[in-house]
Curated annotation (Swiss-Prot):
Homohexamer. It comes from Lactococcus lactis subsp. cremoris (strain MG1363). CDD domains: PPAT. It is found in: Cytoplasm. This is Phosphopantetheine adenylyltransferase. The gene is coaD.
Amino acid sequence: MTEKIGLFTGTFDPLTNGHLDIIKRASQHFDQLYVGIFKNDQKNPLFPTDKRVEMLEEALTNLSVNHKVKVIKHERDLTVNIAKKLGVTAMVRSLRNSQDLEYEKNMFYFNLEMTGIETLFFLAKPELEPLNSTRIRELHAFGQDVSAWVPENVSRELRKLDEQKK
C-alpha cells in the first residue's frame, strides 16, 4: 500500500490557531504531513523564515499528531516541484470563505495539470474562519492583544518584538 503523504504550505507569519487546527485535522489523513514554510517575495515578513520554522515546531510539540508532521522550509521553487520531490500524494489547503475558494480553485487546476497531485480542502471551523495572519499582524501593529488567536509561543515572540521596538 502506498504511503499517504500530504503537503500543507504557507508563510505562517505568524502561525495562528487556525493553521494548527488544519495541521491537526489534516495529519489524521496521512502517514506523513509536511508543513512547508515558504518564502513569499510579495510579502514583507514579520518574522524571518527560520524563526517561523522554530515557532511552528515548538507549537507542534503540544499536538498529539506531531510525530506525523515534519516542518520544511523552502525559499525558491514552485510548491508543486517540492511536492514531487517529496513524493506527495495530496496537497492540503484550507478554505475560510468564498475568496479562498476562488483562489484555491485556480491553484488546484494548475497543481493537478502540472503534477497530477490532488488537493484536499479542509474547511475552517466556524470559530476560526475570521483568522488570518494578515489580520493578526495588523492588530498586533496597533498594539492589540492577539493571544487568543495564536499559540502561546507565538504570542510570546510577538511580545519580544514589542520589547525590541521600545
